[in-house]
């Protein structure tokens, strides 16, 4: 913690960044109790501060700071941190890490305007809603170069740390700024950019570019100017924020080797397009629209043809149009100048404004509906003319494209009519698309401008993205944002604990790694995995008929119940509808999927897009140049056949995922820093903080998640020296004094000696680490120890003070000795004559009076003794009474407990009875269900019986139909024979025409062979007819089997009947048992009532006892008061005696004076005086002893009195508690009595219900009996039917025998006819198949021709492709190797020990280089082998030209080539794996290789890559060389040589690449055919890629673990110079290899040209073959048409017959189903109506009960009011009594004053009495006695008044207690009323639901009726069609016969 002097460099910002020293000291010295100071959960404030009052039974009573007392559970109380942690800068350092501690720390810092706070790795910033001087230039300079712990929390500190890490660690950095809208993300992003622009300036001045004529700024200016431009087009006013960024951005600022700015680029995410066309009332659209209309630049208004009123444009005026905090005119100037600074041309600038104006005009486009049509037409063309002019389009074409877009249907384009709604939606979509594409184009243009082409080394990325969003209505945008945050949180969790683990590693702590990134894996996989939400959404977007419901159903099928993070949302009234819920790390979010498919597809009017592409405005045409329309695809399909089909259709979610993956890969390659922005309140009030809002954001931002992760490890850590200093107090003896001991050892000894959990801490190298909470425990122990030490010091202080007091006492003793000495001196003097005279005369005076006074004092003393004895006796009596009362109380408690146990037993019995009742009801239900099942079985039997009868009738019909079909078949046979003859003649003619072409002849011969096969198939069909006969026989057997089943069913029914009878008996027995139990219950109830009455009487007795006890207590209190009065009187008498003693002493003094005046006296008088003096002294001593005894007795009395009062008070309290308990028990007993009464009622009701049930059961039994009788009758009918069926079956069997005889006669003929029929059918089908096959063959031959045209090219290029694949694989190997090697360089700390073996490793490296060269040579050999194979393939192509029949053979060769390619790929993959293994094994050795050697290896491997990134990689290598700085100055010469060589290699490579590109253009056409084959290969490659990715991840982990080895590498760089010469030699070898590769490329070009010539020749041959095929196809088409005509007629007739038969059966089935459903619905409806009636009766009963309760409540309220009035009356009386007591008090004071006056007079009188005589004294004494009597009487009256006052106060207390009890009763009744009202509401709701259900059932019933009617109509129609078809078939049959 820095001092105030160190904070002075921050200037006026210092108090806003850190507490002053004074505040810190005050905070540490503030009193604090760790055990009682807590945070407590509170519903309004979320958490409040408080102190623990008590803890009991898992509940804690806490008193809050506001004074309220809360009783909560233990888990709702959180311990408070010690004061030294107040306003702590890093919240992770707190001893108690929990939500309230974090919240209050932020709140207290925010109250002090310290808006930045660390939380572990996070920097949390709270929006201050006002300007603070914390961003001044002096603050920037103050933070420059400071470590995080050296300066207070700030965004500049985060930025500077990132900058310093980048320079020192040579690693890319990123700053992730997240938070809700309005939290200050954009402001903090600006500050970060401002900081980097200030500290890393390049020093260049502004330039004027002569070429463009526009002013351009420096790179710093451009980076800063990018912000206003992006804000103008991407920011808008929202409810929370006036300047809210409606897009996310990732700004990369690139730096050079020296840390200066090199370049920058921006990536944007999730622009809110919908804001272009729609805004909420309190919001507005993007700022640019209002800047343009602000009229700051009138030329813009004229150019864009707009007005200055935004309300003229609906797209931008749906919400607000102005913002108080934004000046649109000034902002327009800033935007315009930003466009100029960023280097946009004048044309681009104009096009930006024009497109923005066109979007505004689009909102004014109006369309109307044509009369009598749904077609839309434009309503005026003025607006369209303006919009088209601004976009350089034809307005007529634009309107036509909007109203009549061209749509592709099949291979043709059709103009489609659009409705008004469709057109308006299309216009909105176009406006959004234009604006979005323009925004993205602007970002790319800014990136181009910011790319200065300067050498750049590393970058710092600033991510400004929306935080987690949980709204009432969450759509696709929220899912994307939340998914992004989920990924970022996973990234943070992983990164945070990686750093924690590194800290543990550094400190040498044993720790098993926990990857908290996996905590969120379930949710992330649910969203992005192959069958996750996004993939299902994209899949649904591919289907044309997909809807939101189908998407929802798919989600539910795939994830509901399978994934824990996917849930069905709860329906909440008043909230927006939700379709599914996801459990994110920040909470559960309900998503609404409405419109997701449209949002994801983002459809545009393709016709308008085509217009945009043809626009003369270059910018607009460029914006839509990438869009692939259907027309463009149709026109360019032949040219661009190689393009992927799905490239034009990329969904929003896929694009988002692609961008997100890019972002995550960028972030993973950086060292991240996290900033979380927080909104303190919704009202934008500075300094105010809403607890719930902030907590919600902390959860969403992952701050609390970070704390959770922190708590898993060791969040608290202290340096050993600090720990020793602070906690040495706990056990000072553990650390030996007088000798030096290391702080670590001291800490270890200290912790070992303390009684704590030793697993909760770990010892590091420099610090001791603690688990969360342990440090707080140590703090408590320290506080306790300090308390003990303080008490010891206090004891010592007290001892010292006591010694001082003792010293004083000694001094007093010495002074007493001095006094004694003086007395002794007096004793010596007393023998003087004068003194003797004095002693003699003094006792004579007033001796009589003193004797009397002594006598009176003795009497009073005796009286006090007697009274004391009496009071002690009374006290004993009271104590005995107390003992008896306690015994009685205990007896009463035991009785109450016994009664409570009895009640509990009664309740248990009641519960058992209720359970038995429920069981019986369940049994009754089972019985009824069985009965219903039996009825269903009956119904099924009857249905089966009907079905059997129907099947019998159908069998008869089938036999008749078979006979008819036999006759038809014979007729059809003759007709088909004639047709066959005609066909054979036609075939002969065709054979003559196709005689020239041998191939077609063979095909026709094959067709002839197929017809023969068809004839064979016809014979097979005849066999099937015989099988059909067998099937019929089987059906008869089945019928017999079904009859047997009927018998079995009947047996089952009989068994079920017996079961039912048994169940009935059981039910009757159970009813009897229920009645018995009911009687027992009645008896028990009577017993209970008797017990209750006994209890009532006992309670009344107890109440009477209580009253008596209260009376006794009151009497005792009165007695106590009397004793107090007596004590007071005693005190008064004592005061009197003391007064008299003082008077006597005064008189003695006067007498002595008189004696001295009088002179001498007689010796007798002196002796008398001596005697009297002795007596007087004796009396004085007695008096003093008496007074001492009196005081002692008074003190003991007071003590006893106080004790007895306290005991009596406790007894009174106990008795009051007992009374309250008894009253409560009484009320509970009353309630229990009521409950028992209600139970009795319920039992009686249950009894009634059971009786009803019995009756219903009896009715059911009777019904069952009747049903059983009916079933018996049915069984009898079935037996008769069975007999009839048996006879019929006998007849059928006889008929079958006859028919079989006929069939046996006709079977041969039938078989022959059926064979012929089937042959003809087969012939027709085969002719159709042949036609189709020929058509397909034609198409395939055409396709094959196309294939053959390009086959030679394909064969030629396959070689090149394989070669490229090999080179690619080699380059991948090289890439991996370079990656691993370059990464491995950065982690070489672990290899310090292996320095000595450097020479050996260098030799191994050389061997490795030789091995690589050998591999290159082997690859060249494979390349040659491939060339040879290509030549072979060319020979194969020549052979394929000989004949088309060899195509199959060629395909097999191609497959072989593919297999070889695969094998080669596997070989290359195996080589890759081997190289990876080698890389892993040699990795440890390669770490010590020098920079120059690595650069040369990089050169070697980059040469092999043959890609366009060679320039970039070489520049990277040169930059890596430059990293060495001054040390590696000598290597610059080598760098120049490498650059020269690089330029030569580059030139050679560019030539090779140009030739390769030329070849690739031709290969694209061949790739179309190869795609099918490649897809399989790609899949395997993808699998291998996944394996490689896995290997990547593993290696990345290895690389990360090697990061710590960098320091050793820096030390070893000096040795690199020695290897320089060797590397130069390697470079020369690489040049040779490059030349060799160039020669190979030249040879490949020559081969390619040769193959082109061969391909041209083959093309000519293919054209000739195609012409011949086309002639054949035309001839085939003629034959097919004739065959089709004949086949169509036959097929139509058959199809219609079958269809009608099927429809008839379906209709009959539907009829049966519908009737059954109708019956079911009817029964359901009746049952629902009954339940509704029951519910209505229950509701009426409850309403009556509720009215009674309300009446009772009103009565109670009236009673309460009366009690309150009584209390008021009593209060008034009390006031009166108080007034009277005050008056008496005043009187008392007056009397006391008079007494004092009288006393004064008495003194005067005594003085006079000495002179005047005894009579006057006696009179005055009498007067004094009278006055004393009056005073005593007045005192008694006063005491009585006080007693009365106390009585009234007690009465008032009783009344207040009674009022409180009444109030509680009222509240109880109110609760009861509320509960009953809730019950009523629930019953009403049930009734409503029942009504709804009945209504739905009615609607279902009506619907089914309607369906039934429709089914009947359909059946009628089907029957009529069947009849018509039968008539038609007969007519056809007659025609055929007539033709024959």
UniProtKB/Swiss-Prot annotation:
The modification Pros-methylhistidine is found at residue 758. One of its GO terms (cellular component) is A band. Keywords: Actin-binding, ATP-binding, Calmodulin-binding, Coiled coil, Cytoplasm, Methylation, Motor protein, Muscle protein, Myosin, Nucleotide-binding, Phosphoprotein, Thick filament. Transmembrane segments: none annotated. GO terms for biological process: actin-mediated cell contraction; muscle contraction; plasma membrane repair; response to muscle activity. Residues 844-1940 form a coiled coil. Residues 1154-1173, 1884-1920 are annotated as: Disordered. Residues 786-815 form the IQ domain. It is found in: Cytoplasm, Myofibril. Belongs to the TRAFAC class myosin-kinesin ATPase superfamily. Myosin family. This is Myosin-2. The gene is MYH2.
């Amino acid at each position: 913690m820095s001092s105030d002097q160190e904070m002075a460099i921050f200037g006026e910002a210092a108090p806003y960044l850190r507490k002053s020293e004074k505040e810190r000291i005050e905070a540490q010295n503030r009193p604090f109790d760790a055990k009682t100071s807590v945070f407590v959960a509170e519903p309004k404030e979320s958490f409040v501060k408080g102190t623990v009052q008590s803890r009991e039974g898992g509940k804690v009573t806490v008193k809050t700071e506001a004074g309220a007392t809360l009783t909560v559970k233990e888990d709702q109380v959180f311990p408070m941190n010690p004061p030294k942690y107040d306003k702590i800068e890093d919240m992770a350092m707190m001893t108690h890490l929990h939500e309230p501690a974090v919240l209050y720390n932020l709140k207290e810092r925010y109250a002090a305007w310290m808006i930045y706070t660390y939380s572990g790795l996070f920097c949390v910033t709270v929006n201050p809603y006002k300007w603070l001087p914390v961003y001044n230039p002096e603050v920037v300079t103050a933070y420059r170069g400071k470590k995080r712990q050296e300066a207070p929390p700030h965004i500049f500190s985060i930025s500077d740390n990132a900058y310093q890490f980048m320079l020192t660690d040579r690693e890319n950095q990123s700053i992730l700024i997240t938070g809700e809208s309005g939290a200050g993300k954009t402001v903090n992003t600006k500050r970060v950019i401002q900081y980097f622009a200030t500290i890393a300036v390049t020093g260049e001045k502004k330039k004027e570019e002569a070429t463009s004529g526009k002013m351009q700024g420096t790179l710093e200016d451009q980076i800063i100017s990018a912000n206003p431009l992006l804000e103008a087009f991407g920011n808008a006013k929202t409810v929370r924020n006036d300047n809210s960024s409606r897009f996310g951005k990732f700004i990369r600022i690139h730096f050079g080797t020296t840390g200066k700015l090199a370049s920058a680029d921006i990536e944007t995410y999730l622009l809110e397009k919908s804001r272009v066309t729609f805004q909420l009332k309190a919001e507005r659209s993007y700022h640019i629209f209002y800047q343009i209309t602000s009229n700051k630049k009138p030329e813009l208004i004229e150019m864009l043809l707009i007005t200055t009123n935004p309300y003229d444009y609906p797209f931008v005026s749906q919400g607000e149009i102005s913002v108080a905090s934004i000046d649109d005119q000034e902002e327009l100037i800033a935007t315009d100048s930003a466009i100029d600074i960023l280097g946009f041309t004048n044309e681009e600038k104009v096009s930006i404004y024009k497109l923005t104006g066109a979007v505004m005009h689009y909102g004014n486009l109006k369309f109307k509906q044509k009369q009598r049509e749904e077609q839309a037409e434009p309503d005026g063309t003025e607006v369209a003319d303006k919009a088209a002019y601004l976009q350089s389009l034809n307005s007529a074409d634009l309107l036509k494209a909007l109203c009549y877009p061209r749509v592709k249907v099949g291979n043709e384009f059709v103009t489609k009519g659009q409705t008004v709604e469709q057109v308006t939606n299309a216009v909105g979509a176009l406006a959004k698309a234009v604006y979005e594409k323009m925004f993205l184009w602007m970002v790319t243009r800014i990136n181009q401008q910011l790319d200065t082409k300067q050498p750049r080394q590393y970058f710092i990325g600033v991510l400004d993205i929306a935080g987690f969003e949980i709204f009432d209505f969450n759509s696709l945008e929220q899912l994307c944002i939340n998914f992004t945050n989920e990924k970022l949180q996973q990234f943070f969790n992983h990164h945070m604990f990686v750093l924690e683990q590194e800290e543990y590693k550094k400190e040498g702590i044993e720790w098993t790694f926990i990857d908290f990134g996996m905590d969120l894996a379930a949710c992330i996989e649910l969203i992005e995995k192959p069958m996750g939400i996004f993939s299902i959404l994209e899949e649904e977007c591919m289907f044309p008929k997909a809807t939101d419901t189908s998407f929802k159903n798919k989600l539910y099928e795939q994830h509901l119940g399978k994934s824990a993070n996917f849930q069905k949302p709860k329906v909440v009234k008043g909230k927006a509808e939700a379709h599914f819920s996801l459990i994110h790390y920040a909470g559960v979010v309900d998503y609404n999927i409405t419109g997701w498919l449209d949002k994801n597809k983002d459809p545009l009017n393709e016709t308008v897009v085509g217009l945009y592409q043809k626009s003369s405005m270059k910018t607009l045409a460029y914006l839509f140049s990438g869009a692939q329309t259907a027309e463009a695809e149709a026109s360019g399909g032949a040219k661009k056949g190689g393009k992927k089909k799905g490239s034009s259709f990329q969904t929003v979610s896929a694009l988002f995922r692609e961008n997100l993956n890019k972002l995550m890969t960028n972030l993973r390659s950086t060292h991240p820093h996290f900033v979380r922005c927080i909104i303190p309140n919704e009202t934008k009030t500075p300094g105010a903080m809403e607890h719930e809002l902030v907590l919600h954001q902390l959860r969403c931002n992952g701050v609390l998640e970070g704390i959770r992760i922190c708590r898993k490890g060791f969040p608290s850590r202290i340096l050993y020296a600090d720990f020793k200093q602070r906690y040495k107090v706990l056990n000072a003896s553990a650390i030996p004094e007088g000798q030096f001991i290391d702080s670590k050892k001291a800490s270890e000894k200290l912790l070992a000696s303390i009684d704590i959990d030793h697993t909760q801490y770990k010892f590091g190298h420099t610090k001791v680490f603690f688990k969360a909470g342990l440090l707080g425990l140590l703090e408590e122990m320290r506080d306790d120890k300090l308390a003990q030490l303080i008490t010891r010091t206090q004891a010592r202080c007290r001892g010292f003070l006591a010694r001082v007091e003792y010293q004083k006492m000694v001094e007093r003793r010495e002074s007493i000795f001095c006094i004694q000495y003086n007395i002794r001196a007096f004793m010596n003097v007393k023998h003087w004559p004068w003194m003797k005279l004095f002693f003699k005369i003094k006792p004579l005076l007033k001796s009589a009076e003193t004797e009397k006074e002594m006598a009176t004092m003795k009497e009073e003393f005796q009286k006090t003794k007697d009274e004391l004895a009496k009071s002690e006796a009374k006290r004993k009596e009271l104590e005995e009474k107390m003992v008896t009362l306690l015994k009685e109380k205990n007896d009463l408690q035991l009785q109450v407990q016994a009664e409570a146990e009895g009640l509990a037993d009664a309740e248990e019995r009641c519960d058992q009875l209720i359970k038995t009742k429920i069981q019986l009801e369940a049994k009754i239900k089972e019985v009824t269900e069985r009965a219903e099942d039996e009825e269903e079985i009956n119904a099924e039997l009857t249905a089966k019986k009907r079905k059997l009868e129907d099947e019998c009738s159908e069998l008869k019909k089938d036999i008749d139909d078979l006979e008819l079909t036999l006759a038809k078949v014979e007729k059809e046979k003759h007709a088909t024979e004639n047709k066959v003859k005609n066909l054979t003649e036609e075939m002969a003619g065709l054979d003559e025409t196709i005689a020239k072409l041998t191939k077609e002849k063979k095909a026709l011969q094959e067709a002839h062979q197929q017809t023969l096969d068809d004839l064979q198939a016809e014979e097979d069909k005849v066999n099937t007819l015989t099988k059909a006969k067998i099937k019929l026989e089987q059906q008869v057997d089945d019928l017999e089997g079904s009859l047997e089943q009927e018998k079995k069913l009947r047996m089952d029914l009989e068994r079920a009947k017996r079961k039912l009878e048994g169940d009935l008996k059981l039910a009757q027995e159970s009813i009897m048992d229920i009645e018995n139990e009911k009687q027992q219950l009645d008896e028990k109830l009577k017993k209970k009532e008797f017990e209750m009455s006994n209890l009532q009487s006992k309670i009344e007795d107890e109440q009477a006892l209580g009253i008596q006890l209260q009376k006794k207590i009151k009497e005792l209190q009165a007695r106590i008061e009397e004793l107090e009065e007596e004590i007071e009187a005693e005190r008064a008498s004592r005061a009197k005696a003391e007064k008299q003693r003082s008077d006597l002493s005064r008189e003695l003094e006067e007498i002595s004076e008189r004696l001295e005046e009088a002179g001498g006296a007689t010796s007798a008088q002196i002796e008398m005086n001596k005697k009297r003096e002795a007596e007087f002294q004796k009396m004085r001593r007695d008096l003093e002893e008496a007074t001492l005894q009196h005081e002692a007795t008074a003190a003991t009395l007071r003590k006893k009195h106080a004790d007895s009062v306290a005991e009596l008070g406790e007894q009174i309290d106990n008795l009051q508690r007992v009374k309250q308990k008894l009253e409560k028990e009484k009320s509970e007993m009353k309630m229990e009595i009521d409950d028992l009464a209600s139970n009795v009622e319920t039992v009686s009701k249950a009894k009634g219900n059971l009786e009803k049930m019995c009756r219903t059961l009896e009715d059911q039994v009777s019904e069952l009996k009747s049903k059983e009788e009916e079933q018996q009758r049915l069984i009898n009918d079935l037996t008769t039917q069975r007999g009839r069926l048996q006879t019929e079956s006998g007849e059928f069997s006889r008929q079958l025998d006859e028919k079989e005889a006929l069939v046996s006669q006709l079977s041969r003929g039938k078989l022959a006819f059926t064979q012929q029929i089937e042959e003809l059918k087969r012939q027709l089908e085969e002719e159709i198949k042949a036609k189709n096959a020929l058509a397909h063959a034609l198409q395939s031959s055409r396709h094959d021709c196309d294939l053959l045209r390009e086959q030679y090219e394909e064969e030629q290029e396959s070689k090149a492709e394989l070669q490229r694949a090999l080179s690619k694989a080699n380059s991948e190997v090289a890439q991996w190797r370079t990656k691993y090697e370059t990464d491995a360089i950065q982690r070489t700390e672990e290899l310090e020990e292996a320095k000595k073996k450097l020479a050996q490793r260098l030799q191994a490296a050389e061997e490795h280089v030789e091995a690589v060269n050998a591999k290159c040579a082997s690859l060249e050999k494979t390349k040659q082998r491939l060339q040879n194979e290509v030549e072979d393939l060319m020979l194969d192509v020549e052979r394929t030209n000989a004949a088309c029949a060899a195509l199959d053979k060629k395909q097999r060769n191609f497959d072989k080539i593919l297999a070889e390619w695969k094998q080669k790929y596997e070989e290359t993959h195996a080589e890759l794996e081997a190289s990876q293994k080698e890389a892993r094994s040699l990795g440890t050795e390669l770490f010590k290789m020098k920079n120059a050697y690595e650069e040369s290896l990089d050169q070697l491997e980059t040469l092999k890559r043959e890609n366009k990134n060679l320039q970039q990689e070489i520049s990277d290598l040169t930059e890596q060389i430059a990293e060495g700085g001054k040390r590696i100055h000598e290597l610059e010469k080598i760098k120049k040589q490498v650059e020269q060589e690089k330029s030569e290699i580059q030139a050679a490579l560019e030539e090779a690449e140009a030739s390769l590109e030329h070849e690739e253009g031709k290969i694209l056409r061949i790739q179309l055919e190869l795609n099918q084959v490649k897809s399989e290969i790609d899949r395997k490659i993808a699998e291998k890629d996944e394996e490689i990715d896995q290997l990547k991840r593993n290696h990345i982990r290895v690389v990360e673990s090697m990061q710590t080895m960098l320091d050793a590498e820096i030390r070893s760089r000096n040795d690199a110079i020695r290897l320089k010469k060797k590397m130069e030699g390697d470079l020369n070898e690489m040049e040779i290899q490059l030349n060799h590769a160039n020669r190979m490329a030249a040879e490949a070009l020559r081969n390619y040209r040769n193959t082109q010539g061969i391909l041209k020749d083959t093309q000519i041959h293919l054209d000739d073959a195609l012409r011949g095929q086309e002639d054949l196809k035309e001839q085939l088409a003629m034959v097919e048409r004739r065959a089709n005509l004949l086949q169509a007629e036959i097929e139509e007739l058959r199809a219609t017959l079958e269809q009608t038969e099927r429809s008839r059966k379906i209709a009959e089935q539907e009829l049966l189903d519908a009737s059954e459903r109708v019956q079911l619905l009817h029964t359901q409806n009746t049952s629902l109506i009954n339940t509704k009636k029951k519910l209505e009766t229950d509701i009426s009963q409850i309403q009556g009960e509720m009215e009674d309760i309300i009446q009772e409540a009103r009565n109670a309220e009236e009673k309460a009011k009366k009690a309150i009035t009584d209390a008021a009356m009593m209060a008034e009386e009390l006031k009166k009594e108080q007034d009277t007591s005050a008056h008496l008090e005043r009187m008392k004071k007056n009397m006391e004053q008079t007494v004092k006056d009288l006393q004064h007079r008495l003194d005067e009188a005594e003085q006079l009495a000495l002179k005047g005589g005894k009579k006057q004294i006696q009179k005055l004494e009498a007067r004094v006695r009278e006055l004393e009597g009056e005073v005593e009487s007045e005192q008694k009256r006063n005491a009585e008044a006080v007693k009365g006052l106390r009585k009234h106060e007690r009465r008032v207390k009783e009344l207040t207690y009674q009022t409180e009890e009444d109030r509680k009763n009222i509240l109880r009744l109110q609760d009861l009323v509320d509960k009953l009202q809730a019950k009523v509401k629930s019953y009403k709701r049930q009734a409503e639901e029942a009504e709804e259900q009945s209504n739905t059932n009615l609607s279902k019933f009506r619907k089914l009726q309607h369906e039934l009617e429709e089914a009947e109509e359909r059946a009628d129609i089907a029957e009529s069609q069947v009849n018509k078809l039968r008539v038609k078939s007969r007519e056809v049959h007659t025609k055929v016969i007539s033709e024959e």
